[in-house]
Structures are given as structure tokens and as C-alpha cells.
């Protein structure tokens, strides 16, 4: 079984690659398996990302049919070929469905499952903790990564709760970006050796110094080199360079007007992936069929800004994987 020691570096959050007609509300087979395989192979083979995850918010778990989700799992497992750890997102409205989907991912060959709490009704902290313990018991040989997203899932898991969560040895990681530095230090003191904590790419300075295993990023699908250089700087303890890159990465959210609508927060970046040209994520799925012009404009600005960062921080092949 995968452990926290196996998880570090850059965690790429994958889009659910869409066929050209995948934005139709009557479409039933919208996974572009060919482009998925090409993009995954390029990202792993050329850049040195260390972990791959699917079907989070950016990964569009909320717009897929279960049949499509299964196709995506199968295509991703086949593309990754065990070169890096693969965690399949199975966040759902109820624990039984999440566990059913996670079992399929495990049987298909995924190393772990990425899970947010069931979110239709706001969970209590006690029930959020119990949810992860129940999943760990149901999947004792599968790694569990907590997808901590209070904005979408409407519950913040307090640091102290991880004393109980880490009693389960197969809860091995967390995607997070919602802790103050002091909270993060306390979190790492509790989870050290048991869970790898991945922070947002813009938090690598100073959180890597405080105990983060690495960072998560969906911007890498526009070209991974800025994030690879950031990880390399952190590993080398070149904090001035790390600080500078983090500031540049933070600028990606400031190149256009703040749209102020949560539904476009991840969707605009999928459109930006298409504009950047590193790979083709495809169109947005229904219900995102009416796209405001400001969202389209923002996606173009984001892509142009990111391409400038890729020129500023060119790829140094395999630096991240060999050093992480």
C-alpha cells in the first residue's frame, strides 16, 4: 500500500479531457481518452511531476456521468502506467457512492482516492472525521487523500481533529491551502510521518520550510516549468528564488478582473489550458454552456501570462522528480 513517504513534490490536478462535442447536454461519452493519454504522458515524461490526481473541482467530477468517470479512471490508469502515484477523485453526495466509486478505482489500478466530504448538507466536524475513518476502513489497502476544500464542501477540519484521523494508517495525504503558518506547523507536528500535506503552489514559500511535502497545481497543464523551478528552488533551499517564483505564480490570478463568481474559478483555468497550447483540455461540459465574455477574455490573459512565466522559468528536465 502507498504511504506518506511515497508522496511529495508536485501534484498535478488533472482536467477531465473533453471531446469536441462534450459540451452538449445530451452527450454520453465525453472523455477524450486520446488527448488524456497524450497530455499525461507529456507531463510525466517531459516534466517530472510527482503525483497525479483526477476529478477534483478543476477535474470536473461534478459534470461527469458515472460511465464517463469509469472511462476516465481506466484511461488515466492506462496512461500513467504506475510511473507516479495516482489518486482518483471520488467526491460524492453520500459516502456509499464515494466508496463504491473508490473500489472501482482501486480494482482498475489506482494507488489511492482523493475525497472531499459529502457536501449537499453541511457536515459537522465529527461527521467529516467519521467519514474519512469509514472510508479508510472500507478500503484498508488503498491510500486515502483528504481533499480539504472548505469553500466548496462547507466544513473546515480543525487541526486537532487529525489526531483521530491519523489513527487510520491508510489516510496518507491531504490537499490543503487553508491554514495559517502556525496552524500548519501544528498540523505537521500531528501528521509527520503519517500524512503528506500538499499546499497551493503559491504557498510553497514558506510552507515547504514548515513541513509541506509539496504543492498541488492545475496550472501545470498550461506548461509545468514554472512550478518545477519552484520545487527545485525549495529543495535547494534557495528561498529568494522560491519567493520570487511564488509572487509570479500569484500573479496569474491578477491578470484580469475578479469575476466574483465561484462557478468560474476553476472553469476559467480549463479554458486557459486550451489557450496556452501545452495540451487541449476541451470544452466545458453542461451546465456551463453560456460563457460570459469576461471569462473568455480572462482565460486568454491567464494563458498569455503563464506562457511568459514558462519563458522566464524554462524547463529543466527531470529536476523535480530526481530531487524530490
Label every PLM stretch briefly.
Residues 2-154, 288-289, 313-314:
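Active-site beta->alpha loop and helix N-cap motifs at the rims of alpha/beta catalytic domains
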Residues 9-19, 42-49, 226-324:
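C-terminal alpha-helical cap/extension of soluble enzyme domains
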Residues 33, 66, 159, 236-239, ...:
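Alpha-helix N-capping/helix-start residues
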Residues 36, 73, 98, 132, ...:
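A general structural signal for well-ordered alpha-helical segments in protein cores
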Residues 47-48, 109, 169, 211, ...:
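Glycine-centered loop/turn motif at secondary-structure junctions
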Residues 64-65, 100, 125-128, 158, ...:
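Short secondary-structure transition/capping segments
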Residues 137-140, 150-253, 257-261:
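Catalytic alpha/beta core domains of metabolic enzymes, predominantly
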Amino acid at each position: 500500500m502507498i504511504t506518506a513517504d511515497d508522496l511529495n513534490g508536485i501534484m498535478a490536478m488533472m482536467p477531465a479531457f473533453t471531446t469536441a462535442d462534450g459540451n452538449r447536454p445530451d452527450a454520453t461519452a465525453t472523455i477524450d481518452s486520446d488527448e488524456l493519454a497524450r497530455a499525461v504522458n507529456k507531463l510525466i515524461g517531459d516534466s517530472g511531476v510527482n503525483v497525479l490526481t483526477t476529478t477534483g473541482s478543476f477535474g470536473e467530477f461534478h459534470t461527469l456521468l458515472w460511465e464517463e468517470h469509469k472511462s476516465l479512471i481506466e484511461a488515466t490508469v492506462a496512461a500513467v502506467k504506475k510511473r507516479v502515484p495516482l489518486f482518483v477523485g471520488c467526491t460524492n453526495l453520500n459516502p456509499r457512492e464515494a466508496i463504491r466509486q473508490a473500489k472501482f478505482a482501486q480494482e482498475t489500478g489506482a494507488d489511492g482516492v482523493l475525497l472531499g466530504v459529502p457536501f449537499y448538507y453541511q457536515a459537522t466536524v465529527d461527521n467529516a472525521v467519521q467519514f474519512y475513518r469509514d472510508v479508510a476502513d472500507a478500503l484498508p489497502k488503498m491510500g486515502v487523500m483528504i481533499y480539504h476544500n472548505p469553500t466548496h464542501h462547507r466544513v473546515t477540519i480543525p487541526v486537532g481533529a487529525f489526531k483521530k484521523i491519523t489513527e487510520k494508517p491508510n489516510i496518507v495525504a491531504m490537499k490543503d491551502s487553508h491554514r495559517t503558518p502556525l496552524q500548519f506547523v501544528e498540523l505537521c507536528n500531528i501528521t509527520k510521518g503519517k500524512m503528506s500535506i500538499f499546499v497551493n503552489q503559491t504557498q510553497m514559500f514558506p510552507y515547504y520550510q514548515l513541513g509541506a511535502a509539496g504543492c498541488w497545481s492545475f496550472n501545470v497543464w498550461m506548461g509545468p516549468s514554472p512550478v518545477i523551478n519552484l520545487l527545485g528552488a525549495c529543495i535547494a533551499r534557495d528561498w529568494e528564488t522560491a519567493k520570487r517564483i511564488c509572487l509570479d505564480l500569484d500573479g496569474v490570478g491578477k491578470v484580469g478582473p475578479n469575476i466574483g463568481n465561484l462557478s468560474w474559478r476553476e472553469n476559467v483555468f480549463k479554458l486557459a489550458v486550451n489557450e496556452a497550447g501545452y495540451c487541449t483540455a476541451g470544452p466545458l461540459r453542461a451546465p456551463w454552456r453560456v460563457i460570459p465574455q469576461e471569462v473568455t477574455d480572462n482565460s486568454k490573459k491567464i494563458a498569455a501570462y503563464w506562457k511568459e512565466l514558462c519563458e522566464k522559468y524554462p524547463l529543466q528536465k527531470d529536476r523535480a522528480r530526481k530531487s524530490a
